[in-house]
């Protein structure tokens, strides 16, 4: 039998995400499995998932992390209901040319403004006002976002006192804020997987800054009111017994029906292309790789075969 080396498949061909909790994650007989306390194994198709959210109660073996990295699947360790990210394994972001391109766009003020204006246009489906700084555009954006929250609350008959929650005390927040937090966390997970698969850095943002996922927030904010926030209000209006669980399942279905995994990388490239520059070429005196990376079917940011 011929052995076929493992390699990533494109993000567009993957399921968006799954959540795992209460079990040991390991590789047995070559398969990525979750083993519960009674010893029952659940096979996880790790190579066909963009992002695996690991909730409290999970333990992960070295072999499982290695396999996930080899096939380009993002592992994210999260808190209760997936709303607090503790750490993540980065299977992508492996393109120096794209990282330098992203950094130049973020550090050059006029280029950054072009990118931010494009984000505004995509988010609100209209060109931003002319002759506005990034700070001014952020102010306009913030006002429109608050109005959108208020309109959604009115539409679904939900009491709304503003966007606020305590990440250290999940149960303290009201139902609608918990639903929104759970929904946006799902979107952040799949958005981070896309940023890494495309070869970029999650931390180098254009509107957000100072966070490990600044660029992820930038990208997710473009689409969150089209996809997940209305669903969060809809679920909150029903007052279900387990709102966060319902939100996660609904987000999974939305991501599948909207084919989001196939749209995120083109969205990222469209946003950055607004800067109207080309990715930098290596300096003439730089050494090429001694051992070139093998060609794979994966996206440009994936690290290839392990």
Task: Map each language-model feature to its residues.
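Active-site helix-to-loop segments that bind/position phosphate- or nucleotide-bearing substrates
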Residues: 2-6, 13-14, 22-23, 37, ...
């Amino acid at each position: 039998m011929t052995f076929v080396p493992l390699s990533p498949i494109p993000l567009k061909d993957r399921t968006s995400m799954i959540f795992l909790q209460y079990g040991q994650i390991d590789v047995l007989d070559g398969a990525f499995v979750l083993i519960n306390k009674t010893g029952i194994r659940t096979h996880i198709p790790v190579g066909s998932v963009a992002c695996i959210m690991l909730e409290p109660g999970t333990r992960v073996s070295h072999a499982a992390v290695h396999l996930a990295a080899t096939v380009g699947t993002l592992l994210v360790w999260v808190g209760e209901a997936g709303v607090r990210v503790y750490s993540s394994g980065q299977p992508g972001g492996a393109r120096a040319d794209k990282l330098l391109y992203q950094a130049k766009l973020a550090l050059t003020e006029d280029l950054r403004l072009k990118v931010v204006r494009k984000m505004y246009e995509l988010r609100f489906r209209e060109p931003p006002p002319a002759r506005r700084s990034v700070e001014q555009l952020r102010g306009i954006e913030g006002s429109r976002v608050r109005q959108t929250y208020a309109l959604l609350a009115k539409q679904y008959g939900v009491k709304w006192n503003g966007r606020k929650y305590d990440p250290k005390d999940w149960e303290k927040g009201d139902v609608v804020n918990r639903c929104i937090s759970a929904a946006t966390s799902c979107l952040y997970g799949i958005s981070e997987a896309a940023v890494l698969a495309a070869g970029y850095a999650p931390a180098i943002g254009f509107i957000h800054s100072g966070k490990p996922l600044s660029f992820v927030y930038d990208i997710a904010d473009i689409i969150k009111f089209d996809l997940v926030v209305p669903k969060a209000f809809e679920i909150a209006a029903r007052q279900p017994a387990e709102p966060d669980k319902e939100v996660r399942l609904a987000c999974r279905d939305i991501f599948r029906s909207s084919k989001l995994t196939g749209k995120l990388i083109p969205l990222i490239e469209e946003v950055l292309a607004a800067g109207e520059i080309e990715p930098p070429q290596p300096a003439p005196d730089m050494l090429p790789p001694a051992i070139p990376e093998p060609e794979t079917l994966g996206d440009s940011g994936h690290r290839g075969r392990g």
